[in-house]
């Protein structure tokens, strides 16, 4: 199951890359942002801003550090290395792709949060995906693996949707 999710993720990234300069995709992007802008509420604004805060790099480093401390106490050094290299590799790849594609962010009229740098790919979504994939890989044989899988997928999908909702990224 984890390999299927990785395949789906790679397929999604490939489709996104191919569609970056497609006028139909760009029209869809603008229409989606306008639709979300028209359906904002204070309640949803609060949820999405909260997700944006806990999905950034500082929070990701804190979560992974606490996880690694717990693993260190039980002498699971291989998993600590796996988590560390996954976070480092995913972040490096994401920032390289941002530099390579250098896609502009949506117009500031849609933004509910301050952003900087390129839009594609979303660093928040990369961090959420790396964390979700780590959790899925490490706990795939756990008694509650299906619930863990569902929550991990909900986390990275929610992060991606929240970044679009906040006007920080195109869909």
List PLM regions with ranges.
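Aromatic-anchored segments of alpha-helical transmembrane domains
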Residues: 12-16, 88-95, 154-167
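N-terminal transmembrane-helix/juxtamembrane module of multi-pass inner/ER membrane proteins
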Residues: 1-59, 99-112
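Hydrophobic alpha-helical transmembrane segments of integral membrane proteins
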Residues: 81-110, 170-171
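Interfacial segments of alpha-helical transmembrane regions
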Residues: 3-8, 64-92
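Membrane-embedded catalytic cores of phosphoryl/pyrophosphoryl-handling enzymes
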Residues: 4-5, 111-171
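Membrane-helix interface segments
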Residues: 43-44, 75-80, 107, 142-148
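Hydrophobic alpha-helical transmembrane segments
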Residues: 53-72, 129-132
């Amino acid at each position: 199951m984890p390999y299927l999710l990785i395949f789906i993720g790679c397929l999604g990234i490939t489709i996104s890359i191919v569609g970056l300069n497609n006028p139909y995709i760009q029209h869809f992007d603008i229409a989606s942002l306008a639709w979300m802008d028209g359906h904002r509420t204070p309640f949803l604004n609060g949820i999405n801003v909260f997700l944006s805060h806990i999905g950034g790099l500082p929070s990701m480093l804190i979560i992974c550090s606490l996880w690694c401390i717990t693993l260190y106490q039980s002498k699971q050094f291989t998993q600590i290395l796996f988590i560390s290299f996954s976070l480092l590799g995913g972040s490096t790849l994401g920032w390289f792709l941002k530099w390579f594609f250098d896609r502009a962010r949506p117009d500031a009229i849609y933004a509910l949060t301050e952003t900087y740098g390129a839009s594609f790919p979303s660093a928040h979504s990369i961090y959420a995906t790396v964390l979700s994939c780590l959790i899925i890989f490490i706990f795939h044989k756990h008694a509650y693996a299906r619930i863990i899988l569902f929550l991990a997928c909900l986390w990275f999908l929610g992060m991606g949707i929240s970044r679009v909702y906040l006007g920080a990224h195109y869909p």
